[in-house]
């Protein structure tokens, strides 16, 4: 089955990845080892300012069943059980359990069809939060909604809507978020396919504050293993990164942020090292 639409979270994802993915101003190290029998173990550590955060992730795959167990340095334990093709093609079931905060556990279902993608989740507690999102249409045009309902207060805590237009080299999307208060328009343009050269922009406007944020971004592949990205917003914040794949699925990324209005005070540099064996 060919999936043309995807989920609601896929609307505008190309632009978000271009503008935000892999940018960081801290130090991160990640090591993943995997075995032929479907077991993968990932150890990660992140240093931000004077704080250090660690995480250990174990993943076990067996046919249509995937079990993920994550433990971190804050004594949280997250277990996720995913079953693909749950009873019918395109349907996926996901159970999330969190210790010690068991109230944040949830049961989730995802269904992907050629012309629709639906995600539904419900909290595993006495007064659960219920979320329903969906995207409908074709590869060229799709619309989506994202709604959350709090059964404890009988209130809709979230209702968002989105529209996406897609062509072979251009993607444009429009989001209405935060109960209709925030309007986000974005576009992504693939300039040269062979070099991965792309540009994008995102305009976000808050109606209640009457404030707008405009971000421009670009990316270009220097060679098959090295990518550079840049971005700049209307407040004078500039960022850049260089990412090099020095072996299959292993990356080193150096990125930096600077306030062009106060260069001597605001420069921040981040380093990320991801190793997969």
Swiss-Prot record:
Keywords associated with the record: Ion transport, Membrane, Plastid, Plastid outer membrane, Porin, Transmembrane, Transmembrane beta strand, Transport
Q: What is this protein called?
A: Outer plastidial membrane protein porin
Looking up InterPro entries in the UniProt record yields:
Porin_dom_sf, Porin_Euk, Porin_Euk/Tom40
As for subcellular location, the record says: Plastid outer membrane
Summary of the function given for this chain in its UniProt record = Forms a channel through the cell membrane that allows diffusion of small hydrophilic molecules. The channel adopts an open conformation at low or zero membrane potential and a closed conformation at potentials above 30-40 mV. The open state has a weak anion selectivity whereas the closed state is cation-selective.
Comment block on domains? Consists mainly of membrane-spanning sided beta-sheets.
Provide the family line.
Answer: Belongs to the eukaryotic mitochondrial porin (TC 1.B.8.1) family.
Instruction: Mention one GO biological process in which this protein takes part, according to its record.
Output: monoatomic anion transport
Annotated Gene Ontology cellular components are: mitochondrial membrane; mitochondrial outer membrane; plastid outer membrane; pore complex
Q: Which GO terms describe its molecular function?
A: porin activity; voltage-gated monoatomic anion channel activity
Q: Coiled-coil ranges per the record?
A: none
Residue intervals passing through the bilayer:
none
Its domain of life reads Eukaryota
């Amino acid at each position: 089955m060919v999936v043309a639409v995807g989920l609601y979270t896929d609307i505008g994802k190309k632009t978000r990845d271009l503008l935000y993915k892999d940018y960081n101003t801290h130090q991160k190290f990640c090591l993943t080892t995997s075995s032929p029998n479907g077991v993968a173990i990932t150890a990660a550590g992140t240093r931000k300012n004077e704080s250090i955060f660690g995480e250990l992730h174990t993943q076990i795959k067996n046919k249509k069943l995937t079990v993920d167990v994550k433990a971190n340095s804050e004594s949280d334990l997250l277990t996720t059980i995913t079953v693909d093709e749950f009873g019918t093609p395109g349907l996926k079931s996901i159970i999330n359990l969190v210790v010690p905060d068991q109230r944040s556990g949830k049961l989730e279902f995802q269904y992907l069809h050629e012309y629709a993608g639906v995600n539904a989740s419900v909290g595993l507690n006495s007064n659960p939060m219920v979320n329903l999102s969906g995207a409908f249409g074709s590869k060229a045009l799709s619309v989506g909604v994202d709604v959350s309902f709090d059964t404890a207060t009988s209130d809709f805590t979230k209702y968002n809507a989105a529209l996406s237009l897609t062509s072979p080299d251009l993607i444009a999307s429009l989001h209405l978020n935060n109960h209709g208060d925030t309007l986000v328009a974005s576009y992504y343009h693939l300039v040269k396919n062979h070099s991965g050269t792309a540009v994008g922009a995102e305009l976000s406007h808050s109606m209640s504050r009457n404030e707008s944020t405009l971000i421009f971004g670009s990316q270009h592949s220097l060679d098959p293993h090295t990518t550079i990205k840049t971005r700049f917003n209307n407040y004078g914040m500039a960022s850049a990164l260089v990412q090099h794949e020095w072996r299959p699925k292993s990356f080193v990324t150096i990125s930096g942020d600077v306030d062009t209005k106060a260069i001597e005070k605001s420069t921040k540099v981040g380093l990320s090292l991801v190793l997969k064996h």
